[in-house]
Amino acid sequence: MDTLTKPISAPRRRTTADTVYPILLLVSVTHLLNDMMQSVIPAVYPLLKAKFGFSFAQIGLITLVFQMTSSILQPFVGRYADRHPRPYSLAAGMCFTLAGLFALALAPGFAPILLAVALIGWGSSIFHPESSRVAQLASGGRKGLAQSIFQVGGNAGSAFGPLLAALVVIPYGQTSIMWF
């Protein structure tokens, strides 16, 4: 049989042995860091309310801006990421979040705080679709397990963030937010 008449073999089916656990663990750790940084926002509400004399409506608006930018934009970013995968968007999302934390740490009033939490939200909306895609690619067909490992990182970060904020931000003030 020459090469022209050889049957084409079916593509190799992925097996659970193809699960790339180091990648899953790394993306879970980045999810932990990302969500830890985000969870600082509600943890510092009492500090912001006391320092700037914000009303509960203003605190609610801070939450609204963060949630709108982190949640509403995410499906649009996810759709774009499906069509044009950009692995560097993981780092880009984290950079937006970091810039938002620095801005929040130095914000002198309400409007700059809104901009800071918007940056943090944009970081989240950029980070999550691509990192979830990476977890799925590393799953080796074990998508439920991969998503669970990925999600544990985010949930742990959401749990640790307020605790660390209580230990760091409350004693050292608003500028210590940039330590996250």
Whereabouts are the PLM-identified features?
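Residue-level signature of mid-helix packing/kink "hotspots" within the transmembrane helices
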Residues: S39, Q67-P75, S158-A159
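Short hydrophobic/alpha-helical segments at membrane-entry points of transmembrane helices
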Residues: V27, A111-V117
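Extracellular/periplasmic helix-loop-helix junction of adjacent transmembrane segments
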Residues: V44-S71
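Conserved MFS/SLC helix-loop-helix module at the cytosolic interface between two early adjacent transmembrane helices
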Residues: I72-F110
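Helix-loop-helix hairpin linking two adjacent transmembrane segments in secondary transporters
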Residues: G153-F180
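Extracytoplasmic
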Residues: L26-P46, F54, V77
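Cytoplasmic helix-loop-helix junction between adjacent transmembrane helices
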Residues: A116-G153
